[in-house]
Amino acid sequence: MEQITITAKVQIVATDTDKVLLNKTMSVYCDACNYVSDYVFRTHDLKQFSLNKILYSTLREKFSLKSQMAQSVFKTVIARYKTILENQNEWIKPSFKKPQYDLVWNRDYSLTQNCFSVNTLNGRVKLPYFAEGMSKYFNHSIYRFGTAKLVNKHGKYYLHIPVTYEVEESNISDICNVVGIDRGINFVVATYDSKHKSGFVSGKAIKQKRANYSRLRKELQMRHTPSSRRRLKAIGQRENRWMQDINHQVSKALATGNPKHTLFVLEDLTGIRNVTERVKTKDRYVSVSWSFYDLEQKLIYKAKQNQSSVIKVDPRHTSQCCPACGHTEKSNRNKKIHLFTCKNCGYTSNDDRIGAMNLYRMGINYLADSQVPNTVVTE
């Protein structure tokens, strides 16, 4: 069995009195995080044991935090610093600006009688919730809750709950279908599978919408006003949410639209940013900021849910190699009109489809090298 963790976002319903208690708790928790962050930045001490020994009493007395809340503050700050060190490889002090509150399951929050019981500085409050689309995760014989995060977005309160559950691990010997997936801008994905069927998800409308976002961003950047900066930030967040939703839809369609025990083959796009930064300036925004990685991560965990697997392969020549005769030549591909024409045998097709076909073939070779029985239809 293999464990999968997803985040369930559950909206909770709070009365005006509850909101006051929640806001106060979130604000104090945030202040405590900044206090601990200052100390960690000065000392570079990331050991919870020593932080607890030095700062625990202060958090209890100065911020009136309960025991578990104080421990959660240490964990929140330590996790933020570790993320920064992994990504930046240097000590940068994080600032906790937005009120937040991390809640430990069965200590700071629990689920009873169709309500979440949430701990605050002034005792527990019981909060009803909207269960649409989330109720299946509340079966604790299957799903386990982790440390949740309480957030306030535009006056609405949400619990972001990590939910862990087990699925049957995909065994390579069970593979019955291979899908090559070429990711790009003209087509978000082009696919080719074991039934020799091709599929495309057009990126035209997405590209146009992102171009509109880019133009609006440039206009706002020229104004240099506080309101324009606020709107710039809001637009960036809106665009990210929209693109993540697109990737969610595409990855879900790929994972559920294919049978269980499918092997998805992707190009390993590590270092793609360095490549795309050499494109024309007018095309650079779309190329560099395109969220290939987000789509990849969503497909990986959705594939696991369907007892399928994802592998990444060397992307070199996937759009230059003829799937019919194997002839590889750069001039086989005409990027301007997205057409592939083999200089050796004359085979012609869309260049993104060619990429998907070659990725499919690499998946077949991967299975052959792994000595998997003939469970996949090949050409």
Regions of interest found by a model, annotated:
Residues 1-379:
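Nucleic-acid substrate recognition interfaces
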